[in-house]
Amino acid sequence: NAAGTPARFLERSDADMNTAAGRELAIVALTRLARSDPQSAVGFWNGRLRERFPLADRQYVWAMFATSGARHHLPEAVDWFKKAGEMPLSDEQLAWRTRIALRQENWPEVKNAIERMSLIARNEPVWIYWRGRSLLALGAQEDGQALLGRIAGEHHFYGRLAAEELGMPLQIPKKAATPTREELAEVAALAGMQRALALYRLGLRTEASTEWVWTVRKMNDRALLAAAELARVNGIWDRAINTADRTVAEHDFTLRYPAPYGNVLSKQARARKLDEPLVFGLVRQESRFIADAKSSAGASGLMQLLPSTARRIARKIGMKGFNTSRLGRPEVNAALGAYYLRRVLDGFGGNPALAAAAYNAGPGRARRWRDEKPLEGAIYVETIPFAETRQYVKKVMANTVYYAAVMGGDQRSLKSRLGTIEGAMAMKAEADE
């Protein structure tokens, strides 16, 4: 059938293409095939299908091919987008039109694609940044700098990159005044807060988090800081971080970027010659420092290790008496996770962005997402096909920079940490030597 076996469906007689229903089924089959193999889908389309469709359908199909091709990093996707003509594209399609143009450093196409997005999408930090970069590349310095200036003061991946592009050093905001005893008592007395804390004590983390989020949703900065401090005192690190993250004018970055289990994590980072801010940045994103955290995929602990991975590493490093029930122990999880992170970094020339992508999605995928030629690190990250991994790498890398600032460590810029992602051929040549 068209959805289950699209290639077989497209290979059969095309008599049904004379009807609207038949053409719709063909589009279903082409769409399903294009998800895994855009080039084969285009081959079927060009072979004997394209001319059987009206113009509007042809443009729709080309836009679909182009979006799938861009996700697969196919250079020809740029031309496929052009074959879609002036058909209105969704913001998601325009995002991928932008991303494939970024991989080719086709700045006019980057600018054009972003400017076709809806106003809401254009004002997202990611597209403000890349539109600003495109303007700078095209010689419109004043306009490009003005755009980057809109987000340069924001504390996230693209805010930091924009600030660096404008030559603005990282400055941690002045620490807000510590919540007073009265402010803490006022927040602690809230019925929702009392329910949340009681649920946490009962081990009902999901229900407790829901209650917490509802309780803090309309708080001002002072109340948020008091709630974050209350979470810290109670060892509820995920709520401390997420609540402190919500402040607008008054900030406490020691609550946004805390270092629980500091001795354990720092010891393992030093033992494996890892950048400590990277380790803390990764743990902040993986588990929010919840020692017994478990994911839907079965990963456990501070550094979210799968049982199979943990067993393999434990054998490798000679950890005696290991069983997966020990993954909730910070010292065990950190020892295994630090070893794995070191191995991943070594496999990718020490590049933390590639290592983070590999840690989240697997080394094989991280390798496949490279280009034949060298890529700017930020472009590699923005063109990761998986939305979850793309956001994960951005968070880990931004976390690393802010932890370095809070901890007083290596003050390298985010751009320098991202580095240049060597082309696939260059890395293969190095591996063969």
Write out the residue ranges for each language-model feature.
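Long, contiguous interaction/recruitment modules in multidomain scaffold/adaptor proteins
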Residues: 1-10, 153-174
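Alpha-helical segment of the N-proximal tetratricopeptide repeat
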Residues: 25-36, 65-68, 188-214
